[in-house]
C-alpha cells in the first residue's frame, strides 16, 4: 500500500501569495509514503542540513525548506525558482535530490548578495537503510538499524547509533563530528576531526585527520599526517606516517607500522596476546602491566632501549649503532610476545603506575 502526498507552498508578500520576511522568501515541499521494512532512503543535497529521525512507523516523511535571502526581491524570487527537489517514490526506495540551476553554482553561493539554504527534515523507519550525501551542511541522524552510507564534505556529522556492521562513512573538511555508537564499517576521512564514543570493528583510512575513539573493539587503520586516539581498545592494527598515536588501555593485540611520528600506549593489559611494532623516526613508549607475561625481541638501529622493568635478557648485543635485546618478562604458563623493530627512535618500557 502506498500513500503519496505532495504540497508545494509559495508565500508571497501582500495578497500576491508570497510572504517576504524582510528580504527573505521560502519554498516548502512535503512528501510522505509508506515503505517496506528494508527500504533504501537516498538523499542528495548541498548548502543546508539533513535532520533525520528514525521511528517505529512504516512511513517516510520528508519536509524540505528552501530559503533565499538578499536585498533585491526579483533576484531572490529568481533564485528561489531555480531550486527544486526531484523525487522518486516507491515502497522499496525513496530518492530525493536537490536540483540547483547550474548558473547558480558554487561561485554564486559564496560571492552573490543573495544567500540560500536547503534544509531537509526526515522521518523514516529505523529498519531502513540510508544513502546520504550532503555538502556544506550538517547531517544529523539519531538511530538506525539498517546500513548507513553517508558522505559529507565541508560540513559536520552528528550521529547517534548505527547498528549495522557494514556502514560506510566518508567525509572531507569536516570538524567536530561525533558518533555515539557504530557497530562496524569503514570510515574515510581527510582534513577532518571526529570523535566516536563506542564502536565495534572499524576500518579507518584517513589523511590530515584527528580521530578519537573512546572505546572500540577492533580498529584497523591507515592514517597519515594526523592524530589517532583510542582510550580503550581490543585490537589495534595499522600503518601511519607522521602520525601521533595515543592509546589508553590495550586489551588484546597491537600491530603497528609507523614512520615519523610517536607511539604511546599507556597500559598493556595481561590479556594482550601480542605486540608487534615496526617503526622509523618514531619514539615508542609502552606502559606494561606488571602481570603481563611475554617474550620479547627488540631490534634497534640508531636508537636505544630505556626500561625500569626487570627484563631478563637472554641475549643482549650492542654493536656500534645497533642494539638488540631478547628475553622474557614475568615468566608464566601463558606467554605473549613483544616484538619491536625500530630505526632512529627511542623505546621506553615502563611499569603501569596503579
Q: What is each stretch, according to the model?
A:
Residues 2-354:
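Intrinsically disordered, low-complexity terminal regions
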Amino acid at each position: 500500500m502506498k500513500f503519496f502526498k505532495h504540497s508545494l507552498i509559495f508565500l508571497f508578500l501582500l495578497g500576491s501569495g508570497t510572504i517576504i520576511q524582510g528580504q527573505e522568501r521560502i519554498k516548502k515541499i512535503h512528501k510522505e509514503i509508506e515503505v517496506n521494512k528494508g527500504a533504501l532512503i537516498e538523499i542528495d543535497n548541498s548548502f543546508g542540513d539533513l535532520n533525520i529521525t528514525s521511528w517505529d512507523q512504516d512511513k517516510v516523511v520528508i519536509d524540505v525548506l528552501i530559503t533565499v535571502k538578499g536585498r533585491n526581491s526579483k533576484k531572490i524570487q529568481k533564485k528561489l525558482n531555480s531550486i527544486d527537489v526531484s523525487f522518486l517514490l516507491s515502497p522499496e526506495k525513496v530518492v530525493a535530490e536537490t536540483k540547483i540551476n547550474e548558473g547558480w553554482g558554487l561561485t554564486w553561493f559564496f560571492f552573490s548578495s543573495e544567500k540560500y539554504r536547503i534544509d531537509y527534515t526526515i522521518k523514516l523507519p529505523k529498519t531502513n537503510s540510508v544513502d546520504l550525501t550532503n555538502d556544506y551542511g550538517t547531517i544529523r541522524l539519531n538511530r538506525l538499524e539498517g546500513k548507513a552510507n553517508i558522505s559529507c564534505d565541508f560540513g559536520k556529522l552528528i550521529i547517534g547509533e548505527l547498528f549495522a556492521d557494514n556502514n560506510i562513512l566518508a567525509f572531507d573538511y569536516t570538524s567536530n563530528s561525533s558518533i555515539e555508537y557504530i557497530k562496524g564499517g569503514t570510515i574515510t576521512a581527510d582534513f577532518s576531526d571526529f570523535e566516536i564514543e563506542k564502536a565495534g570493528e572499524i576500518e579507518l583510512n584517513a589523511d590530515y585527520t584527528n580521530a578519537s575513539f573512546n572505546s572500540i573493539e577492533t580498529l584497523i587503520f591507515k592514517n597519515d599526517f594526523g592524530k589517532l586516539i583510542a582510550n580503550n581498545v581490543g585490537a589495534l592494527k595499522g600503518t601511519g606516517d607522521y602520525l601521533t598515536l595515543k592509546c589508553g588501555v590495550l586489551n588484546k593485540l597491537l600491530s603497528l607500522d609507523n614512520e615519523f611520528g610517536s607511539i604511546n600506549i599507556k597500559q598493556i593489559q595481561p590479556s594482550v596476546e601480542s605486540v608487534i611494532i615496526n617503526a622509523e623516526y618514531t619514539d615508542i613508549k609502552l606502559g606494561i602491566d606488571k602481570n603481563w607475561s611475554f617474550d620479547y625481541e627488540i631490534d634497534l638501529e640508531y636508537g636505544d632501549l630505556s626500561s625500569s622493568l626487570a627484563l631478563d635478557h637472554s641475549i643482549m648485543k650492542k654493536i656500534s649503532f645497533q642494539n638488540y635485546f631478547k628475553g622474557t618478562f614475568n615468566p608464566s604458563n601463558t606467554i605473549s610476545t613483544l616484538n619491536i623493530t625500530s630505526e632512529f627512535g627511542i623505546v621506553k618500557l615502563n611499569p603501569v603506575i596503579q
